[in-house]
């Protein structure tokens, strides 16, 4: 087998009809974890329903339907391989909770793949003021997804088909647009593709002899190639934050007979090891980690990205819960936030938001009502420059610096220190009305919390 390939996460963004599903389906289909039998079954069903022309998207549709019904699908279906990477598609938009997922970050994407449709009138609809192309790209950038690949899709349906002129026009427009957001177009691979016909997906297309390939220039090494798969292969490998102090937001806490209390969650930063003394915030409980396991196997250490369960001594299920954060008691332990300052972008709110507004925030695994205590300044959402001090209200499209106060104890961090704990979605009326990035946290001085006997013993022994 040789060395394991590096795992990377991508998020696929773009307007509804840009062909994201077909393109993604094509990659999964040709390089992915779906076995031949399943593919044949899908093809047969698609043909019976007269959806033969829809087979790649159909693959994704089947997966999505199962995902939405809460059937935990075999996640290998959302994976495919390039020569260098195992790629996981962490979310495909069109999924109701896409924006929320992208922000609360079931995982952080290493790269965004923006699909734009080249068909007559389609590109214009996608990038128009109310098209989703802009919003998705802006979100990706705001949330720290700094690498981007652009697939100019449906090249087979331009006028005339595979038109170089149309492709160049789109590249020019998208470059201007992503530059305004903050991406540097020189670092972005643009690839003319047909997710349906397969042009420039895995193999160079014979239909576009004019396309001499894509090139990116960046300080960590330049790259060039022809296909979308090659562009994915040239994503810069992520650096996982093992050197930071531990932060592990809890997804659940189980009580397991004969073992005891087992919190479960994903290590976001740092390392979790048996024998460590951890503090849970905001509840301020400190205890010793007895064992750590993943997929029912004991680990000597858990690293960022690992979903683990860990057994803690002398702590009841009532002491800790989902949304709490575990950290190393001796190395910048997590603390309750009395309040925090954030930069927010209002996405879709029907009215005006003023001080006192108290929607629910989804930040890492916490889900807590927070009050917009003070609107400090309105800013330009691209440059971050101040537009006005102390605005009276905010409306859709506005960006602002806001002081927020949680309604219940909560643990968050600044985006610059701990990115996964420093971005949030604002939910109201069953939709995401705003997104935010935390600039600074006012930490509550922790009183004497609960320190278990095993923690005291472990601390003495050290």
Swiss-Prot record:
Chain residue ranges for the region called G5: 194-196
Region annotation G3: where it falls in the sequence: 91-94
A matching Pfam family: GTP_EFTU_D2
Cross-link (Glycyl lysine isopeptide (Lys-Gly) (interchain with G-Cter in ubiquitin)): 385
Enzyme class: hydrolase
Entry EC number(s): 3.6.5.-
Modified residues (N6-acetyllysine): 165, 172, 273, 392, 439
UniProt region (G2), positions on chain: 70-74
GO cellular component: cortical actin cytoskeleton; cytoplasm; cytosol; cytosolic ribosome; GABA-ergic synapse; lysosomal membrane; nucleolus; nucleus
GO biological process: cellular response to epidermal growth factor stimulus; cellular response to nerve growth factor stimulus; cellular response to xenobiotic stimulus; negative regulation of reactive oxygen species biosynthetic process; positive regulation of apoptotic process; positive regulation of neuron projection development; regulation of postsynaptic specialization assembly; translation
Family matches, as CDD domains: EF1_alpha, EF1_alpha_II, EF1_alpha_III
Family label: Belongs to the TRAFAC class translation factor GTPase superfamily. Classic translation factor GTPase family. EF-Tu/EF-1A subfamily.
Functional description taken from the UniProt entry: Translation elongation factor that catalyzes the GTP-dependent binding of aminoacyl-tRNA (aa-tRNA) to the A-site of ribosomes during the elongation phase of protein synthesis. Base pairing between the mRNA codon and the aa-tRNA anticodon promotes GTP hydrolysis, releasing the aa-tRNA from EEF1A1 and allowing its accommodation into the ribosome. The growing protein chain is subsequently transferred from the P-site peptidyl tRNA to the A-site aa-tRNA, extending it by one amino acid through ribosome-catalyzed peptide bond formation.
Record-given protein name: Elongation factor 1-alpha 1
Gene for this chain: Eef1a1
């Amino acid at each position: 087998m040789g060395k394991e390939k590096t795992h990377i996460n991508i998020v696929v963004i773009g307007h509804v009809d840009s062909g994201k599903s077909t393109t993604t389906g094509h990659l999964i289909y040709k390089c992915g974890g779906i076995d031949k039998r399943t593919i044949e079954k899908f093809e047969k069903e698609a043909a019976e329903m007269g959806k033969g022309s829809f087979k790649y998207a159909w693959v994704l549709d089947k997966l999505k339907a199962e995902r939405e019904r809460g059937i935990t699908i075999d996640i290998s279906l959302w994976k495919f391989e390039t020569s260098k990477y195992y790629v996981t598609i962490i979310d495909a938009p069109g999924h109701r909770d896409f924006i929320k997922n992208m922000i609360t970050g079931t995982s952080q994407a290493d790269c965004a793949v923006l699909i734009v449709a080249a068909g007559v009138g389609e590109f214009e609809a996608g990038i128009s003021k109310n098209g989703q192309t802009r919003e998705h790209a802006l979100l990706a950038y705001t949330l720290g997804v700094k690498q981007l690949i652009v697939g100019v899709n449906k090249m087979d349906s331009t006028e005339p088909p595979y038109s170089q002129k149309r492709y160049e026009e789109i590249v020019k427009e998208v470059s201007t647009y992503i530059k305004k957001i903050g991406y540097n177009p020189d670092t972005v691979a643009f690839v003319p593709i047909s997710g349906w016909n397969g042009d420039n997906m895995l193999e160079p297309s014979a239909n576009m002899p004019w396309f001499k390939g894509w090139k990116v220039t960046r300080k960590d090494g330049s790259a060039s190639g022809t296909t979308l798969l090659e562009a994915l292969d040239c994503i810069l490998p992520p650096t996982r934050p093992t050197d930071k102090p531990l932060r592990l937001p809890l997804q659940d806490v189980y009580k397991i007979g004969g073992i005891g209390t087992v919190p479960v969650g994903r290590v976001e930063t740092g390392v979790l090891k048996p024998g460590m003394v951890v503090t849970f915030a905001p509840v301020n409980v400190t205890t010793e980690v007895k064992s750590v396991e993943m997929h029912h196997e004991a680990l000597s250490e858990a690293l960022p990205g690992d979903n683990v369960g860990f057994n803690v001594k002398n702590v009841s299920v009532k002491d800790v819960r989902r949304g709490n954060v575990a950290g190393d008691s001796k190395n910048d332990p997590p603390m309750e936030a009395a309040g925090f300052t954030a930069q927010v972008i209002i996405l879709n709110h029907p009215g005006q938001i003023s001080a006192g507004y108290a929607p629910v925030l989804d930040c890492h695994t916490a889900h807590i009502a927070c009050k917009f205590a003070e609107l400090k300044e309105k800013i330009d959402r691209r440059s971050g420059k101040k537009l006005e001090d102390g605005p009276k209200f905010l409306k859709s499209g506005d960006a602002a610096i806001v002081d927020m106060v949680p309604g219940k104890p909560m643990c968050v961090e600044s985006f610059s220190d701990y990115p996964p704990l420093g971005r949030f979605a604002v939910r109201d009326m069953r939709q995401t009305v705003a997104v935010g990035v935390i600039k600074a946290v006012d930490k509550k001085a922790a009183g004497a919390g609960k320190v278990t006997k095993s923690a005291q013993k472990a601390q003495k022994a050290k």
